[in-house]
Amino acid sequence: MAAEEATLTVRLIRSFEHRNFKPVVYHGVNLHQTVKEFIIFLKQDVPLRTSLPPPLRNYKYDTLKILHQAHKAKTNELVLGLEDDDTLLLKEDRTLKDSGVASETEIAFFCGEDYKRYKANPISSW
């Protein structure tokens, strides 16, 4: 089977409370790789991106969640929607394609512990 390649936007979320995030576009992403393989790639790539400020490059990202899929409705949340975790949080043992990721999908990359704290008390600092 030929590798399916896609363009994905990964939103690096440093802080939910302060709405501190930065999108990074990746071209030619293989949708048949597992979520775990993509996380490993991101953890290796993000620290090397000199265009990102150090607080975003050197953070403990570990979780991916689908923010928006092309040609579908967007959430009103400014940083990340807190609903539908069962379907939108990507499981490491599945492929990106099996998880619902397609070309032009926007994915959030963040620290799972930060997300749990924010979900329990979703207050913004500004």
Curated annotation (Swiss-Prot):
Pfam families according to UniProt: DUF2340
Annotated protein name in UniProt: UPF0538 protein C2orf76 homolog
Record family assignment: Belongs to the UPF0538 family.
